[in-house]
């Protein structure tokens, strides 16, 4: 089953006269990792280059049962080029993650993510789930003012997201966790904000 990720810019602050948020655009992303090896992600960039979607085939961890494993972990690193015109800088405002957990008694899953512009250090988040669970989840990461990192003024940047999902079980009970979406709801939503600069 393919998993959908939608990356979209929601540009929130007022524009300077010489550059507008309409000039900000996203490029073709690069990706890699055990959760998104080469050839397992389909990328669609919108005509206005303001949003893109990625379809994942393998971002899922499974343990117990026929796997014979008590622990599994996968990761995915994504790099998205962001064109930033002169007179503007951008920052990440929040990112939402959607997925699914099937966790029996005593099983756990853990989702970790850090996001940053290349060459900078950004915030990192961790969310742990404990069984019994058999449901979708939504993780909302809204950055505080102290955690926001701005790009250089008028400098094109790569927006990087390094994420991992792991699951652990006991007594060979089947458990799984994924970053996914079963409908048109995005699995990951990136919201950017921007400001004028000199």
Q: Can you say where each PLM-predicted feature lies in the sequence?
A:
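N-terminal leader/pro-regions and domain N-caps
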Residues: 20-65
């Amino acid at each position: 089953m393919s998993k959908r990720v939608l990356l979209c810019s929601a540009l929130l602050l007022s524009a300077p006269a010489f550059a507008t948020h309409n000039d900000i655009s996203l490029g073709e992303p690069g990706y890699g990792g055990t959760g998104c090896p080469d050839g397992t992600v389909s990328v669609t960039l919108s005509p206005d280059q303001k949003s893109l979607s990625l379809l994942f085939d393998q971002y899922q961890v499974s343990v117990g049962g026929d796997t014979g494993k008590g622990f599994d972990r996968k990761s995915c690193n994504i790099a998205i080029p962001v064109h930033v015109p002169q007179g503007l800088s951008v920052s990440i405002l929040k990112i939402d993650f959607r997925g699914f957990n099937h966790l029996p008694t005593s099983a756990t899953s853990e989702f970790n993510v850090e996001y940053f512009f290349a060459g900078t250090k950004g915030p990192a988040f961790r969310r742990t789930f404990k069984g019994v669970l058999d449901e979708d989840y939504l993780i909302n990461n809204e950055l505080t003012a102290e955690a926001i990192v701005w790009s250089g003024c008028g400098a094109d940047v790569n927006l990087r997201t390094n994420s991992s999902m792991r699951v652990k079980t006991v007594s060979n009970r089947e458990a799984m966790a994924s970053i996914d979406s079963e409908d048109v709801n995005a699995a990951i939503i990136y919201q950017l904000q921007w400001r004028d600069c000199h």
